[in-house]
Each structure stands twice: as C-alpha cells, then as structure tokens.
C-alpha cells in the first residue's frame, strides 16, 4: 500500500493500518522491572529528530522517507514539542472559528451538499503547514527478536508514517495513542523512521477547541516489544453490591502469541494481603470472576482506596514471561428514582474544573511534574473533579486521578463549534458530525479510542461525548456506543440543549453552560427528568468568580443539582522574552500578530499560565470547602 495525500480530504478515511485501541495497562518482564518502574519491553524515541518545515503540501519534501533522500536542508526539533513553539510557524489562538476563516473558503465535505466531497480542500490547501520528521535509531538489544510496535501518544493533526522506506500507516485523532506494527520492516540497526504531520485535514473540522492551534508530535513516541505471550487488552469490571459493602470482581483478558501456559491472577489490598487468587490455562480470551467479596473498601474522593491487581503470564514450563500490574477501586455511580446522582449510595457533589493541558513554555506538551502540581493545587483548594476539556489527556493523568480520588469526566476529542455557531448565532446548516453519514465512523472511532484506552480507570465517572458540536444522529450513535459498552458509568453531553427532541437519546444528565442560578432552580423545581450539571460555569476571566455562592446554595436546596466544572483551571498563555523590559512575560492570544484571534479570551483560568493562583482561587477554596 502507498500513502495517499488525498486522505486528508476524506472524512471516511481517518486510520490506515492503525491497530485497534486497547487498555493502557503497563507490562513488565518480571517483578524487579515493575519495582524499578522500568520495562525492558519499551524503548523511547523522544529526543532530537531531523526536521523540515514546509508552509504548504506543495512545497514539502515528498520523497523524504526514502533511504537515499538528501536531508542536508533539514534542521532539528525536539520530540515531544509543538512545531509553532520551535519558531517554525505562527502561533494562533482562536475560540470558535477555524484558523482559515477570512483567508480560505472551506466547508465540511458532504455537509451542505451531499455530493460535494470538497476534494483538495486540505491536500492542496495553501495554509496547511507540514512537518517532516526523521529519526535514526538502533533497536535496543532487549527488544530484538520480538514483534515491535510503535506508539505515538499524540500528533496534531494528521500523520503518515514510514519505516526504512516502507509505508506503515496513517492516523488522525490527535489526542489518543496511535499504534502501528513495525515488525515486518524493522532492523536491529540503522532504522530510518519518517513521519509526516499535516496541520489540517478533515479531522480539523472535529478539533475546533478553544485553544492555541498547534501541530506536530507533541507527546511521547516509543517502541514496544512483546513477549511470546502478551496481554493485549484488559477489561476490569469491579461491581459494588446493593448493600454497598460487598463486591464482585470480573476481568476479561485478551492474549496474542503462544497460548501454551497459564495465567495467575491475584488481587491484594493495601496491606499486601490477597483477597482473590485464581489460576487458569492460557487462551486467546480468558475471564476471571470472583464470588462475593465481603466488606470491601469503597473508592471515593475522601478515601481513594485502590486494590492491586497482579497478572502473571507463564509459559508451558512455568516460567514468567509477562507481569501486568494494575490498580483499581470499587465504586458505584447511579441515578436513583428521584433523579439524584449517587456515588456509593450517597449524593454526589462535583466541585470541578475544566482543565486544558498547559505549560507556559511548552504549550500542550506537558510533563508529569506539571500534572502532579495540578493535583496538589486541586487538593489545596477543595477541587474534587476534573473535565478533560475537550480531548483525552496524557495517560499518567488518569492514574493520578485514580490515586488521588479526583472524579473525572473523560471527554472525547470532539468540538465542531465553528460549523454551527456563527457570529454568536445558532446556524447549523453545515454542521458536522451532525447527521451526515460520511462523518459517523470518524466520531465513533474517537469514542472507541477514548473508551478502550481508559476504560479501567476508577476515577472516570462520566464519559463525555465532546463539546459544543450541536447534535444529530451521529452524536446519538456515540451515546449508544457508550451505553452498549459500559453500564458502570454515566454519559454526558451538553450540546443536545440545542436539539431538545433528542434529549431522550443523548446524555444521562441535563447539562448546561453558564445557566444563571435562578434558571437552574427553575428547572429543578419543575419535575426534572434528569439530574442537573453545569459542565462550564463561573467563567474565570479577569477579576472573576463573584456570586459563586449563588450556585453553591443550590446543592443544599436541590439534591438533583450535582454541581459543576468551573471554566477553567489554567490560562493559556506563553512565556516569552520581552526585549524592551528584558524580562520573561506572559503573552496571550493576539500578542503574536495572530489574526484572526480571540485575544485575551485565552486567559480565563483560576491560575496564570505559570501556575500562580489568581485571587479567584480563594473564592473557590472557600465555597468548594463547604461541601467537601
């Protein structure tokens, strides 16, 4: 198969040779590797890569992936990082519009005219910058003689991959891992990995989030080797019984490779005492189910109790070939007959924030240290919940939320604001995904990626279908996907407020943005059909968050009011050296000669971009502290 640049124009082509999404479980060779948190099955490709920036597809080095290509005109770029923050391209912050508005006329394929494929819209677009990446590497000795995959944790926005001159695959969906099989073409030494990243494709219509519009390999890249038998997917289903004291543990495991041997599974409490042990023969699919486990510890914000799961994979001689550790908790979320959301039988209260991934120096390419600082800030200010606005976050964030009892709304990578809201008005004539058949599989794929990757994380209480994408049959299909695959969580989507006739088919929650407290109370007084949530409220721009108490009072008055997520946690601003003041200063949208721009609207966080709290954080600490 050969790569085809026309895939950029086709909403029905969003993955080519990309492996199916699966659980994010770690795996190790033995217990020593686990204890040292180092897997010999992994090889990082982070670091300096050769790089060529092109202003449009026509000027890109088309044959750069070939082994004999002359790369003397290439420079270097660190991976992970944003292309724009390495001074190759223009920084631009936009809220609702698309980056090309006012410059190039585009409409989503098949949206206005069912026969209009919009051919050449992106493959010939003069505004579509391209990053051509090359990485030379040798395979670590520990990875040799194994099947080898490559995982790109995040690439904005469309990516083609070659290895040693051979086309490997194509991927979109910028914020979930893209995994490819390299086994057929990889060598022990002198490998040449080539990656071509386009800033725009049909995926751009689905990724119109309120943020700086970056591109490139902005998350880690790594190689994975697999032992002779490998756990490819883990699906945990810990269930809390009706008495909220006992539980049942179920796990479904899928294996690849040799199936001669056995699997040993154990579950330990925090003291290291086993509460469950089972041993079964290997098979392509294995299921473990416990009898009733009495007096289990429940997981919540106050007591984020996690059990330790250990899965040992043994070959036919009894030798350990793979160890899979995973922590999970028992918790139960449900809506009772009074339309009250209960967690472990008690009324759930969300003291939440919307959180973009952000670092003032590196943009959305953040570190574990950034995440840990944010968790500390949550705890200091009585924040107990987070919405991953408006895309899946880096995998370590989900583990941190599990460990620290942070309730999570796990949102899909979907926002198409600019296709239906124009000049502040609702005008959905060219909305996607809407009910356009050609866009359905792309958004179902995003839902599947989000679900399969993060399905085992106890902290996730809500799946969110996306943000500000209007509503239609494709959003209904996403809702149905989650309902079919996961009965242990609730589904959220705010955009259905614009299509009230679909409310019975979309979202378990009546979700709004910035609805005044009086109107919230009016809904709750009039026989509410669903519990109520503000998925965005208390817009934190400037000297803000006054009147927060009016919302918090609703928690005491109406048990159907679950609370909400403040918009938002941290400013999107960049630390830049100012030659006049000779100081590093924070610059916002519009400060980079970016036009069009939504200017300082990028600065509506409870913290400045350098993670210094704003005065409004005091208000949050006080009011969220009233219902810890």
Curated annotation (Swiss-Prot):
Protein name listed in UniProt: Beta-galactosidase large subunit
Family membership noted in the UniProt record: Belongs to the glycosyl hydrolase 2 family.
The protein's role, per its UniProt record: Component of a beta-galactosidase.
Molecular function per GO: beta-galactosidase activity
EC number: 3.2.1.23
Keyword terms, alphabetized: Glycosidase, Hydrolase
GO annotation, biological process: lactose catabolic process
Keyword Hydrolase on entry: yes
Reaction(s) catalysed (UniProt annotation): Hydrolysis of terminal non-reducing beta-D-galactose residues in beta-D-galactosides
Active site: 468, 536
Enzyme class per UniProt: hydrolase
Domain of life: Bacteria
Keyword Acyltransferase: no
Signal peptide: none
GO CC list: beta-galactosidase complex
Database matches in PROSITE patterns: GLYCOSYL_HYDROL_F2_1, GLYCOSYL_HYDROL_F2_2
Quaternary structure and partners: Heterodimer of a large (LacL) and a small subunit (LacM).
